[in-house]
Amino acid sequence: MNSPLRHDRPALPRMIIRGLFRRCAWCGGKGAFFKSWYGKNDRCNTCGLSWQRNLEGFELGAATMGVFITFGTIIAWMIFSVIAGVALVPLLVVAGGLAVVWPVLWYPNTYTVWFGVDLFIRRPSEEDLAEAEAALAAGRP
């Protein structure tokens, strides 16, 4: 794992892969922002970087990632079902189940993946990194 207070930006694929495994996209720390499956901390437990970064609507990006993953999964299921000759009723039951359950299960992952995309688009400022270091020094991730 990288040093928690690193200032160089990881590559986008690395940040996305870290996000898929609920790790901090910046430092790779386990658990990142989560104290439970859905309960979030204000900062990464390892590097201290804040997930909010003074922007309104950050949650919208995570929700959008969830929509893309859910729709992609449903479309893949439907294509597979049509090619395999699955009857219409089972096809729709599974697709409906995926539409309801998939976003709920994947929310923490889509959240950390979106955080990685956001970090790639808008690199943390020196002020963000200084606040992260101060939060770690104060013992309040």
Regions found by a protein language model. Give the residues of each.
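Short cysteine-rich clusters marking metal-coordination/redox-active sites
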Residues: 24-28, 44-47
